[in-house]
Amino acid sequence: MSAPKNEMYYSLLEWFKTLNLNAPHADAESLADGVALAQALNQFAPESFTDAWLSKIKASAVGSNWRLRMSNLKKVTQSVYDYYSDVLNYSLSDFSKPDLQRIAEKCDLGELERLLQLVLGCAVNCAEKQSYITEIMCLEEELQANIMRALQELEATRQASTPEGGVASSLSRGSRTGLLDSKAVQEDRDALAQKCFETEKKMLLLIDEKTNLQQELHKLQQEFARLEQHSTVIGDDGVSLGPVQTGSVRYNELRRQLDLLKEELLQSEGAREDLKIKAQQQDTDLLHMQMRIEELMKSSAEVTTLKDEVDVLRESNDKLKICEAQLDTYKKKLEDYNDLKKQVKILEERSADYVQQNAQFEEDAKRYANTKGQVELFKKEIQDLHAKLDAESSKNVKLEFDNKNLEGKNLALQRAKDSLLKERDNLREAVDELKCGQLSSSTALTGTTVSRELQPSATVEKLQRLEAENKALREGQGGQTALAQLLDDANKRCENLREQLKTANERILSLSHASQSDDPILKESEFGKQIKQLMELNEQKTLQLEEAVTQSTSLQCKVTQLETNLSAREQEILVYDAKYRKCVEKAKEVIKSIDPRIASALDASVLEKSADLVEEEPKPKMSVMEEQLMTSAFYRLGVNAQRDAIDSKLAILMGSGQTFLARQRQSAPRKSLSAMKSK
């Protein structure tokens, strides 16, 4: 099918093969490097395409290097355009420039055709154009017609007037020898017959004139002899003309007449010779014309036979067009069938993918359900851990506080011991003076001071009461959600810390009041230390409060993120389910368009399957997969049956020798249901 498309290219290539070039120029690959084209241009116009310019064209080591080809072709086309604009005064603005990259890379025939068209224009417009035109005239008529069409397309783009504008017309006149040959032969034969008739008439007239001149010459000779015999001659008027002697008037006149007659005789003889030569030439022309007429008669007979063959070929061409149209329709139908097959395959693959995605989404949903339970467990564990942490922290604070109290008591006891030792020394000195009553009073006083220091503080009771309330509140709020519990726990911890801070402040105040009654210096140092410790505890509690708040916010963010992910997964599952249903509906429509019988069977099977699925929704995963595989296999069976039916139709259509309408009237062969069931 590529030859009719590039008919002009092959005609131009046949003309280019007639040139005597050193470089190979037989096919498109040899022309794609531009070497043969450059040599041809140098041969056409060596004054414009000089040898120095030709040496710039790289002939060796080009091979398959398309960049070197591209550079050669650029040089050739630029020089050709310069030659057209500067030398021929042509404007090629309307002529589409050939794509050199496609020629260099792919040897494109369409672009080579335009490049050869430009080279042809250089050939028929150069100084030696007549020789190249005669070479073109020696080619076949079909090639001449294509070359003439190429020149006409090239001249249609010319905008400046040039004296070589009639080249295409001369080629067109020389190439019109097809069906008009018979008329030309008839006209030439009539013209030659008319010429022969006119030459024969001229010959007869000249022969008559020759005989008349000969008779007149004979009469003159007789008259001259008679006049020489008689001395005197009487004229027409009766007057004597005198003797014919040399020097006389009569003699001179007769002499003059004789000279005139001789000149006329010579002229008549020259004319006779000319006529004889013309007659011989006319005879030879007549023979040539007769031979030409015979040749033309033979050519007219050949033309008639060729006309008959053309008519036969025309009829066969019409039949071929009809067959090609039918073939195109069949090809389109086959392409549509292949497209439908591809679409069905794609839909099957998509349905399988959707089934896999649905299974994966189900697994993800189950996994997320498990993770949901785990998250709830983790929430409960976090709450328990927070409760334990609060209990341990409160215990730690209590122990630290008790430790500090015990240390203070120990210091107080040590001081009391020192004072007692001093008093003992004093009492030993005054043992003689003071008796047992004083000793008992002093011991009672010391016992009261010690008992006062060892009494439990009110803050410990308040802390115990607050812890009990905290535990009761935690137990009462155990039924709320995880986030609310976390927030409540954080708030409770804040309240506990605030209450502890309050109690610490109250204790500081109580201790400050107690310090006023005891030794001020020692109490201030002890209470200063306790105040510092309580401030540090306050800072630690505030830090713990902030950490608890941040942990609660982070846990809340994680829970919200997990909930959003779960909702997004559920939406994706719904979207993929809808897409799967749409694809199933499209597959049903395609199968209905292919064969409604299979489609009805498929609808019934799909309805049954859907009813079974509705009844048995909580089926295991493997049974669902088996049912989906069975439905896809049933779809594939329907497609295969339809394909076999179409193949049998095509085989019947291609094998039978009937007409297209007769084949269309026949009923399509149908396969039995038993054959389909056996498959």
Swiss-Prot record:
Sequence similarity: Belongs to the hook family.
Gene Ontology biological process terms from the UniProt entry: cytoplasmic microtubule organization; cytoskeleton-dependent intracellular transport; determination of adult lifespan; endocytosis
GO terms assigned for molecular function: dynein light intermediate chain binding; microtubule binding; small GTPase binding
UniProt KW Transferase keyword: no
A cellular component term, taken from the record's GO annotations: synapse
UniProt-annotated location(s): Cytoplasm, Cytoskeleton; Endosome; Synapse
Entry's free-text remark on domains: The coiled coil domain mediates homodimerization.
Superkingdom as given in the UniProt entry: Eukaryota
Assembly notes: Homodimer. Interacts with microtubules via its N-terminus.
Calponin-homology (CH) domain: residues covered: 6-123
Pfam family, one: HOOK
Record gene name: hook
CDD domains from the UniProt entry: HkD_Hook
Keywords, in A-Z order: Coiled coil, Cytoplasm, Cytoskeleton, Developmental protein, Endocytosis, Endosome, Microtubule, Synapse
Coiled coil segments of this chain: 135-437, 480-574
Function: Involved in endocytic trafficking by stabilizing organelles of the endocytic pathway. Probably acts as a cytoskeletal linker protein required to tether endosome vesicles to the cytoskeleton. Involved in modulation of endocytosis at stages required for down-regulation of membrane proteins that control synapse size. Not involved in synaptic vesicle recycling. Required in R7 cells for boss endocytosis into multivesicular bodies (MVBs). Has a role in regulating adult longevity.
The protein, known as: Protein hook
